[in-house]
């Protein structure tokens, strides 16, 4: 509940312009809070079984690990914002923490996708990652130039065209506000009022 209230307050203040922050910070905060709530809401036990049994000990620990990875990766972006903005992409070497949090967030996102959308989308994402890592081995036009693991993690985690791209940008601004407004209308029964008003007008 505390995370949900914090997310609502943060999104409303940033989307309305009451709190002006760089888009990267807004997106990182959005992803960190949403993933943390998701791992609390959809425990690994319920995600793995249609008929949940008592959760094994590792289930709770795995959830905590995923929350730590999600929150830690987002916090790293926020606290090291100046460093990320000043570094030269694909020229400056990545630090050990860059690699650690980047890889951790990728794993957390894949696990969150599995819990919400199932294995199909995870398999598609996994194939895309495998292509990025090993696509240089494919012949002809199917292949691409060699990309080091550091380059892939950098592109996904430290640049604006990876995880923090336009899709998350839309989610962190327009989409979230619409979902919040829709949920508010539903819980306050205002949706039926608007529906009846529309029927009267037409």
Predicted regions and their residues:
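Extended aliphatic helical segments
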Residues: 26, 31-34, 116, 122-124, ...
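C-terminal ends of transmembrane helices
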Residues: 39-52, 109-114, 187-188, 192
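Conserved, well-structured core domains of diverse proteins
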Residues: 1-93, 99-103
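A sequence-level detector of short, solvent-exposed, charge-rich linear segments
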Residues: 91-94, 128, 132, 199-200
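Membrane-embedded alpha-helical segments and adjacent helix-loop junctions characteristic
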Residues: 106, 134-202
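Membrane-helix interfacial "entry" motifs
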Residues: 55-59, 91-95, 107, 163, ...
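Hydrophobic membrane-targeting alpha-helices
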Residues: 8-15, 40, 74-78, 112, ...
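Hydrophobic or amphipathic alpha-helical targeting/insertion segments
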Residues: 64-72, 83-86, 99-157
């Amino acid at each position: 509940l505390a995370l949900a209230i914090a997310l609502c307050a943060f999104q409303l203040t940033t989307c309305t312009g009451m709190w002006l922050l760089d888009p990267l910070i807004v997106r990182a905060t959005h992803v960190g809070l949403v993933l943390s709530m998701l791992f609390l809401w959809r425990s690994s036990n319920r995600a793995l079984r249609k008929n949940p049994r008592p959760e094994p000990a590792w289930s709770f620990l795995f959830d905590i690990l995923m929350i730590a990875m999600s929150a830690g990766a987002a916090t790293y972006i926020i606290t090291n914002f100046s460093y990320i903005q000043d570094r030269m992409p694909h020229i400056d070497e990545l630090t050990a923490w860059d690699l650690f949090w980047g890889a951790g967030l990728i794993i957390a996102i894949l696990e969150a996708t599995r819990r919400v959308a199932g294995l199909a989308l995870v398999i598609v994402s996994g194939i895309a990652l495998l292509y990025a890592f090993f696509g240089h081995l494919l012949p002809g036009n199917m292949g691409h130039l060699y990309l080091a693991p550091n380059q892939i993690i950098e592109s996904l985690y430290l640049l604006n065209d990876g995880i923090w791209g336009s899709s998350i940008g839309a989610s962190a601004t327009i989409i979230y506000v619409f979902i919040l407004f829709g949920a508010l209308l539903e819980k306050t029964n205002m949706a039926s009022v608007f529906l009846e008003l529309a029927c009267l007008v037409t």
